[in-house]
A protein has these predicted regions:
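A short helix-to-beta-strand connector/capping loop
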Residues: 1-3, 45, 87
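Conserved phosphoryl-transfer motifs of two-component systems
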Residues: 107
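Glycine-rich phosphate-binding "P-loop"
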Residues: 1-14
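Conserved P-loop NTPase nucleotide-binding/switch module
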Residues: 100-102
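C-terminal helicase lobe and adjacent C-terminal extensions/tails of nucleic-acid helicase motors
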Residues: 14-29, 34, 38-41, 47-64, ...
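Conserved two-lobed SF2 helicase motor
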Residues: 79-98
Length: 299
């Protein structure tokens, strides 16, 4: 067991940050980009922020800097004792850091989610098993505007209270058995062959309307922050053509209603191509990512 999983229950932002400040390096993972941004602004000292409001290129640069800082910290303080406050590292991120990101921090704090998310978050703590004790703290933010409670969250909360080690195979087995049991009726009801035995009468239109492979509420926005990306946007504007694959590193994601707000502020244009570009870079910050008002950074 590389990590000890601890359930903190409901906790305020200030209390959470006070607890994370006791660790030489900590990773705080929250469910929304706005929550990540709010926490990041409250932190003093060496800090990093990651969310999909930032371009893929900026996220890659920040991750590179984080890895470098963590290696320097471990080299200078191999036992992680008596680390001065100015050398402590705090990372605030959304769940994007849970998938395929190679980081090893001293302590992880994960907002309550499904068991799979929490175990993935734990994979960013004591990855190589060098320390005898490493902690993952699971919390629920007090006064959070986002109070969407899911089946997965309810079951995970129960299991955190029931099992000493939630990474144990018995706990994982119970988690998926309980989810399947609760969702079995819905799965059966929405299975194509259960609804209609005759192929000719399968309501394909209805299935197409209900099926979403990717969350269609989110859209991509190009942020041209260097000469290469500015030239690609110029080609898009004047030649109406561009290699979209090359633009991927310069894109961030946002909700459709957020894009609409930026369009109303005249800071986004697609030049008639359907590929939206940020035309006012005062609405982007390399630490926070996309801003929805030019004054957002100072709030």
């Amino acid at each position: 067991q590389k990590c000890n999983y601890n359930y903190l229950g409901e906790i305020g932002e200030n209390e959470l940050l006070a607890k994370s400040s006791l660790s030489p390096s900590s990773l705080i993972i929250v469910d929304t980009r706005k929550a990540a941004r709010k926490l990041y602004k409250k932190i003093s000292g060496k800090k990093y922020h990651l969310s999909t409001y930032m371009t893929a290129l900026d996220r890659a640069i920040i991750l590179k800097n984080i890895r470098k800082e963590l290696k320097c910290l471990e080299k200078e303080f191999p036992d992680f004792k008596n680390v001065p406050e100015e050398r402590q590292i705090t990372i605030v991120s959304t769940s994007l850091i849970e998938a395929g990101v190679d980081l090893d921090v001293y302590t992880v704090f994960r907002e309550l989610k499904g068991l799979d998310n929490i175990l993935q978050a734990g994979g960013r703590c004591n990855r190589e098993g060098k320390r005898k004790r490493a902690d993952v703290f699971v919390f629920e933010l007090l006064d959070s505007k986002k109070k969407a409670i899911s089946v997965e969250m309810d079951i995970t909360r129960d299991l955190l209270k029931k099992y000493e080690d939630i990474s144990d195979s018995a706990c994982i087995k119970e988690y998926y058995e309980r989810i399947f049991s609760l969702k079995e009726a819905s799965i059966s009801q929405n299975t194509m062959h259960c609804i209609c035995d005759n192929f000719r009468y399968i309501p394909f239109k209805k299935y197409a309307e209900n099926f979403e492979l990717i969350d269609s509420r989110t859209v991509s926005l190009v942020v041209p922050r260097d000469e290469k990306s500015r030239q690609m946007v110029a080609d898009l504007k004047y030649k109406q053509t561009v290699d979209e694959r090359k633009l991927q590193n310069y894109t961030c994601s946002l909700y459709k209603n957020e894009l609409d707000d930026l369009i109303k502020q005249n800071v986004v244009d697609d030049f008639g191509t359907g590929i939206y570009c940020l035309t006012n870079l005062d609405y982007y910050d390399e630490e926070l990512g996309l801003l929805f008002e030019a004054s957002d950074y100072f709030l």
